[in-house]
């Protein structure tokens, strides 16, 4: 595998990752675009500093892992080449900077194109609201109002929880929870622990033995939003 082939592979991975994020939600796509833009801006600034005084470019200094969320860190897009030290004197940094500036302009254009897509104008989110409404008003099984919403990205889960929980509570008085395995979960039930086991118990009280694990608790979760962490260790 040549260096040129490796770099072409990285470019393709970047494109695929962006498309996956866009397919998931415009919110996740926007976050990733902003993170890449931040990385590029940091690199351009490092080149400017070198032109002013000279230094060694350390990619680990340009972007710390905390700059990216858990989803982004688990893609090859952000794991290739970050630990390599590069002496700018050994490369055509002028051309590199020019290409980075073009990338920054394109990313800025993408940000502007999606800036007006608020939750109210997010067709995919509004379609989900319609599906929830139909499920609640016309359940397959009488009285069954349970909904399980899966997503590949924790950013999308956050976005869905922020909007679905409000919609479900205001329209139908239903409680919503979110679990992603990255941070502590969330729920609209006051004072309820939002760890995975508690959330699953309140979402599926019969199969999880809620009457034994949480005796006297009337809390019940109707809508659960999460990533594949929900299925870990579950039958």
Predicted regions and their residues:
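Helicase motor interdomain insertion/brace
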Residues: 1-194, 214, 220-232
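Surface-exposed acidic, glycine/proline-enriched linker/cap segments
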Residues: 190-215
């Amino acid at each position: 595998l040549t260096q040129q082939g490796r770099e072409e592979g990285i470019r393709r991975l970047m494109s695929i990752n962006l498309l996956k994020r866009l397919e998931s939600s415009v919110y996740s796509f926007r976050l990733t675009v902003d993170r890449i833009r931040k990385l590029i801006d940091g690199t351009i600034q490092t080149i400017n500093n070198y032109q002013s005084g000279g230094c060694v470019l350390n990619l680990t200094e340009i972007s710390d892992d905390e700059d990216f969320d858990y989803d982004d860190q688990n893609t090859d897009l952000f794991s290739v080449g970050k630990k390599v030290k590069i002496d700018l004197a050994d490369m055509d940094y002028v051309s590199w900077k020019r290409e980075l500036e073009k990338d920054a302009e394109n990313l800025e254009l993408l940000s502007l194109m999606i800036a007006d897509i608020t939750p109210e104008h997010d067709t995919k989110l509004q379609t989900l609201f319609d599906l929830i409404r139909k499920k609640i008003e016309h359940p397959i099984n009488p009285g069954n109002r349970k909904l399980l919403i899966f997503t590949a990205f924790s950013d999308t889960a956050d976005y869905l929880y922020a909007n679905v929980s409000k919609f479900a509570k205001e329209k139908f008085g239903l409680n919503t929870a979110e679990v992603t395995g990255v941070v502590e979960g969330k729920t609209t039930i006051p004072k309820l622990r939002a760890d995975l086991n508690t959330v699953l118990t309140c979402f599926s009280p019969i199969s999880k033995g809620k009457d034994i694990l949480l005796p006297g608790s009337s809390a019940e979760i109707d809508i659960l939003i999460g990533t594949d962490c929900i299925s870990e260790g579950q039958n």
